[in-house]
Amino acid sequence: MHSKVIIIGSGPAGHTAAIYLARAELKPVLYEGMLANGIAAGGQLTTTTDVENYPGFPDGIMGPLLMEKFREQSVKYGTCIITETVSKLDLSKRPFKYWCESDENTCHTADVVVMATGAYARRLHIPGEETYWQRGISACAVCDGAAPIFRGKCLSVVGGGDSAAEESLFLTRYATKVYLLVRRDKLRASAVMAKRLLNHPKIEVIWNTVVLRSLGDGHLLNRLEIKNVKTQVVSELHVSGLFYAIGHEPATALVRGQVECDDNGYIITKNGGPETNIKGFFAAGDVQDKKWRQAVTSAGSGCMAGLAAERLLAEEEEMKNIEKNKK
């Protein structure tokens, strides 16, 4: 099968790109993945309960429902959505070649590829994590910290870098107390962030500490089992929230070694846009954004990728017509 443009990924970036491309009558094909990176089609928002910071929903909206609406709009304008995972992609020349997980013997081609596979938060994979995921455990304080289950409660953050410091400081707006659990005896955060963190009256840093288990009543998290790695003393910490701030992994394994990426694996784009060092290959959303990582910024990035892809295809079509008329 040959397509003018395919989109790999089904989060806000992928669907927004699809909507713009479909409205331009380019008949985009969107591969939404089948539990790619352990996440269902729709990306990280499908694991989020209330989304309260996406414009247009003053009362908030459930993450899975928001992604259903994205998908519905993509289909409405003519996007062909395939519930399949792209397992191999060859960017050596155009049209680009790709293969799908269910049939790796069949090669497909596309003139343009929009990569919107996102990034996923690193987890601790501790006992109780699955039970209390989005029931007290989260990987995004900005996304979830204002939720009713966290307001006026004692909360905890795991990590030692700038992200952990930022998330801890953010949570002080809603929490009565924030515990920052740091595995080492010092922070990796910048001096400025560390100073703000250590001087905040609501924040207490617990050094040399790891989380062993998350515990609760079967419905909501209410405490953690923690261990001091120097003394080996195990104790319980009573908190209603545990936020992971131990980094993200961009889902770029498909293209590493082919397209320019930074040291952390994020695709490098040009001048804040979606263009990469390979003509016809665009990146959108968290796959190229290690700073903001919000649904609304991903959607904006997808818009740019859709418009850029449309413009490239239009320019190339115009050049073909000029060459044809010369003959």
Curated annotation (Swiss-Prot):
GO terms for biological process: removal of superoxide radicals. Homodimer. Coiled coil: none annotated. Binds 1 FAD per subunit. This is Thioredoxin reductase. FAD binds at residues 10-13, 39-40, 44, 53, 86, 143, 286, 293-295. It is found in: Cytoplasm. GO terms for molecular function: thioredoxin-disulfide reductase (NADPH) activity. It comes from Pneumocystis jirovecii (Human pneumocystis pneumonia agent). It catalyses: [thioredoxin]-dithiol + NADP(+) = [thioredoxin]-disulfide + NADPH + H(+).
